[in-house]
Each structure stands twice: as structure tokens, then as C-alpha cells.
A protein has these predicted regions:
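Hydrophobic alpha-helical elements at and bordering transmembrane segments
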Residues: 64, 75, 120-124, 128
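Predominantly long cytosolic amphipathic alpha-helical stalk/bundle segments
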Residues: 9-95, 99-111, 143-176
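Glycine-rich helix-loop "coupling/hinge" segments at transmembrane-helix boundaries
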Residues: 107-126
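Hydrophobic alpha-helical transmembrane segments of polytopic membrane proteins
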Residues: 124-143
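Hydrophobic alpha-helical membrane-embedded segments
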Residues: 1-7
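Generic detection of intrinsically disordered/low-complexity segments and helix-coil linkers/edges
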Residues: 99, 119, 136-139
């Protein structure tokens, strides 16, 4: 997911300028080829819009939005799993903590009136190790999840901006 988001975020700053120039020069096929060669979610979205040139503007806009939704869905593919790990790992660690403490109290009860510290150490060790384990897994997953969500939101903003720019290109008069 990280690699897909990273690849999707790369866009040539001149991409839309080149698309505008090709469309205004009537080089529709060249514009489509540029989109295919660029191979990013934004390029695929614009390619679908170019393929709809000549149809009503609402059809063009709908086609672009459909591709954008599909592309965002692909990018979000692994995020629910990562969110589950981020939320679940600390809870599993906490469960281990509770089980370790239960073990400690059971050992204390079994020992009767004399409590040896080494007897308590085993259960407390389990409690602390599982807590640490859950946090070691959960914290990076939490930060990773939020980082990827922020990257996707930035990409969605770029997709919206490029969609608007493309619709503006289609609304410009053709220069001869």
C-alpha cells in the first residue's frame, strides 16, 4: 500500500500543461498516449475524461469522478488491516497484562501466607512483556496508518484540482 501511494503521488508538474496544449492543438491521441505513459491515478482519471470528449460535460465529469473513486479505493486497500493492527495490538497486549496479573494473584493464593518475590516475578514478567509487545506493534502501525491516510488525502486533493483544471481546459475555446 505504501509503495502504491508513493507511486501515485508522483506527478510531472507540466502534465496538465501538456494535456492542455495537446487538446487545444487537437492532438487528442497524443494526450491519451501521455496519460497511458504517465500511469498514475491522476493520469488515468484525465485519460477517461479525454476519452469522453464530445459527450455532454456532465458525462465527462461523471466518468472522471468514477475513475477517481476507483483509484482512491485501490489506494485505501490495505488501510483497514493496518488500522486493525494499530487498534488490536495494544488490546492484545493489555489482555496479556491482565492474564499475567491473574497468574500472579493465583500464585500468591496458592502460596498461602508466605509470598516469595520470585513467585510473583513470573506473572508480572508475562504482564510487562505482553504490554510492551502490544505497544511495539501498535504504535508504529498507528503512526503508519495516519501517515498513509494523510498521503491519500493529499492525493485526493491533487486529483480534485486536476479534475477542475481538465474541465476548465474543455471549456476553453479552441485556438487555431
Amino acid at each position: 500500500s505504501f509503495m502504491a501511494i508513493r507511486k501515485a503521488s508522483v506527478l510531472d508538474m507540466n502534465f496538465m500543461n501538456r494535456i492542455r496544449d495537446y487538446i487545444s492543438d487537437g492532438k487528442i491521441h497524443t494526450a491519451v498516449n501521455l496519460c497511458k505513459k504517465t500511469d498514475t491515478p491522476i493520469a488515468r482519471m484525465i485519460e477517461k475524461g479525454i476519452e469522453r470528449i464530445g459527450r455532454p460535460m456532465s458525462d465527462v465529469q461523471t466518468a472522471i469522478e468514477n475513475v477517481a473513486n476507483l483509484e482512491v479505493s485501490k489506494l485505501e486497500n490495505g488501510l483497514p488491516f493496518l488500522a486493525t493492527i494499530a487498534g488490536g495490538a495494544p488490546m492484545i497486549g493489555f489482555l496479556g497484562t491482565v492474564l499475567g496479573m491473574v497468574q500472579t494473584f493465583m500464585d500468591m493464593a496458592a502460596a498461602g501466607g508466605t509470598v516469595d518475590l520470585s513467585l510473583l516475578a513470573s506473572g508480572m514478567y508475562v504482564a510487562m512483556v505482553t504490554t510492551v509487545g502490544g505497544l511495539i506493534v501498535g504504535i508504529p502501525a498507528y503512526f503508519g496508518y495516519n501517515y498513509l491516510v494523510a498521503r491519500i488525502e493529499k492525493l485526493v486533493f491533487q486529483m480534485e484540482a486536476n479534475s477542475i483544471a481538465f474541465m476548465d481546459i474543455l471549456n476553453q475555446p479552441v485556438q487555431k
